[in-house]
Amino acid sequence: MIRERFPQAPAKRDVIGQLPTWVSWESMPAAEFSPSLWRIPVGIAEATLEACAFELYEGEHAMVAGNPRSGKSSLLVAFARLVSRARAAAEQAVSAALASGDATAAENARMDAAEVPEVWAVFDQRSGLVNAPEGVFDRVFESKNASAQVQAALQDAAGPVLLLIDDGDRVDDPMNVFDAIVKGDFPDVHIIATGKPTDLRPLYSHWTKAIRKFRTGAVVQPNVDTDMDMFGSIPRRAPVQLSVGRGYAFLAGSPVLVQLMSPEDSQHRGGL
């Protein structure tokens, strides 16, 4: 009857959204950096269909657990691309402030730009990070010698650092530098590491064990029978298929079903 009375009325839109199966880093909001808090987007939350983010306070770190080809390494590259975008925006703000002749605005813009971290990456030749876009990492360290190399590099670091460590369960720490970072000895350095759940779990005295205690991270394509205890409990049944890049992000200790962002551009999907 209503359709007959109002034939030109648009059809009612479906109020139930659908979690996308792929999300580009380009569609994510800007990463935010301050001395006390970093907010780095990770993907789209199933419950809200809005972007969600890791929140890392001073001295905090995150872990992304998943099996090979689950999408965990790709997420590290996406993080790096978000930081690169933030740096470019900060540099543009400085240039605009200088061009305006406003000395106060220029100084404030410089201070904001100084809060954007450098991105250092630790990986080996088997890692998906070898295919990252050129220039996305400010420094690269080979997994085998990373402990000593990162320790030396930190002596020259002039500002904050986002340290991305792929397959952290295979990265030893003879110099105890990663352990020192996790304990808060370098408050301007935040680690986001990846690892395979079955390899992370038995590492009781490894530096990755301490990162998991922060309860910020993600479990990608989790096995509900074996991965329930990585950061906290997760639902045994998901409302959607847990395909590549899907899993549970732990935000402030609570699990959120997400589609993680991809490091690929919208126009070049499949290139990484």
List PLM regions with ranges.
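P-loop NTPase catalytic phosphate-binding loop
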Residues: 32-213
